[in-house]
Amino acid sequence: MMMPELVVALDYPESEQAVAMAARLQGSCPWVKVGLELYTAAGPDILRRLKDMGFSVFLDLKFFDIPNTVRGAVRSSVCAGADMVNIHLLGGARMAQAAVQGLQEGCECKGLAAPPVLLGVTVLTSMAQQDLPAGLDLPLDSVVDVLARSGREWGLNGVVCSGYEVESIKKSCGTDYICLTPGIRPAAADDDQRRTMTPQQAARAGSDYLVVGRPVTGAADPAGAAYSIMESVRQA
């Protein structure tokens, strides 16, 4: 079993809280995630601050717009320092290919030899079968598989998906196709997520990155919680 990397979600309404938590996490995890709430409040400067602290940054904004807008947004994200970005695969081929172009342009802007990771969002882990739009008759896992295979064809590096779909995605898209799994919970509680897994389950399924938020950031010792999660994966 390959060891996945831990990504801690900094889901805060302003930058100082996020930076304070990041300071407590230094040395315990390689990645942090900046989502819509924090990025809207803090802007691109939060990426610089986190990278100056030694973290790789997953900018989780799930771009979904007309192709030219997404191209520019991805380019700007890379220029701002994002190491991983994502788009909604439901945006289709032209939007995804524009995102790939924006990624390349961002690399030129930053002088990067290796491009950041570009992922496609399949179906949110907060959704279950009954949450899919009326008229979409495919089983949820089939929707995920179709979107994942499309992302591969369009030039993306991988997908954001629940742990339940990782094994089938790896089979249909190849073991080098990255699977980043949110909704990771050390215990049974699922909060606002539906399709959750423990770190051990997701690692055994083949996830490459595990996104954990409140179980780490809400702990009395966040760094200790991060270490414990990864130790549980090593022993799985």
From Swiss-Prot:
<comment type="function">
    <text>Catalyzes the decarboxylation of orotidine 5'-monophosphate (OMP) to uridine 5'-monophosphate (UMP).</text>
</comment>
<dbReference type="InterPro" id="IPR014732">
    <property type="entry name" value="OMPdecase"/>
</dbReference>
<dbReference type="GO" id="GO:0006207">
    <property type="term" value="P:'de novo' pyrimidine nucleobase biosynthetic process"/>
</dbReference>
<feature type="binding site">
    <location>
        <position position="213"/>
    </location>
    <ligand>
        <name>substrate</name>
    </ligand>
</feature>
<feature type="binding site">
    <location>
        <position position="185"/>
    </location>
    <ligand>
        <name>substrate</name>
    </ligand>
</feature>
<keyword id="KW-0665">Pyrimidine biosynthesis</keyword>
<comment type="pathway">
    <text>Pyrimidine metabolism; UMP biosynthesis via de novo pathway; UMP from orotate: step 2/2.</text>
</comment>
<keyword id="KW-0210">Decarboxylase</keyword>
<feature type="binding site">
    <location>
        <position position="214"/>
    </location>
    <ligand>
        <name>substrate</name>
    </ligand>
</feature>
<dbReference type="GO" id="GO:0005829">
    <property type="term" value="C:cytosol"/>
</dbReference>
<dbReference type="GO" id="GO:0044205">
    <property type="term" value="P:'de novo' UMP biosynthetic process"/>
</dbReference>
<feature type="binding site">
    <location>
        <position position="11"/>
    </location>
    <ligand>
        <name>substrate</name>
    </ligand>
</feature>
<dbReference type="InterPro" id="IPR001754">
    <property type="entry name" value="OMPdeCOase_dom"/>
</dbReference>
<dbReference type="InterPro" id="IPR013785">
    <property type="entry name" value="Aldolase_TIM"/>
</dbReference>
<feature type="active site" description="Proton donor">
    <location>
        <position position="62"/>
    </location>
</feature>
<comment type="subunit">
    <text>Homodimer.</text>
</comment>
<feature type="binding site">
    <location>
        <begin position="60"/>
        <end position="69"/>
    </location>
    <ligand>
        <name>substrate</name>
    </ligand>
</feature>
<dbReference type="InterPro" id="IPR011060">
    <property type="entry name" value="RibuloseP-bd_barrel"/>
</dbReference>
<feature type="binding site">
    <location>
        <position position="193"/>
    </location>
    <ligand>
        <name>substrate</name>
    </ligand>
</feature>
<feature type="binding site">
    <location>
        <position position="125"/>
    </location>
    <ligand>
        <name>substrate</name>
    </ligand>
</feature>
<protein>
    <recommendedName>
        <fullName>Orotidine 5'-phosphate decarboxylase</fullName>
        <ecNumber>4.1.1.23</ecNumber>
    </recommendedName>
</protein>
<dbReference type="GO" id="GO:0004590">
    <property type="term" value="F:orotidine-5'-phosphate decarboxylase activity"/>
</dbReference>
<keyword id="KW-0456">Lyase</keyword>
<dbReference type="Pfam" id="PF00215">
    <property type="entry name" value="OMPdecase"/>
</dbReference>
<dbReference type="InterPro" id="IPR047596">
    <property type="entry name" value="OMPdecase_bac"/>
</dbReference>
<feature type="binding site">
    <location>
        <position position="33"/>
    </location>
    <ligand>
        <name>substrate</name>
    </ligand>
</feature>
<comment type="similarity">
    <text>Belongs to the OMP decarboxylase family. Type 1 subfamily.</text>
</comment>
<dbReference type="InterPro" id="IPR018089">
    <property type="entry name" value="OMPdecase_AS"/>
</dbReference>
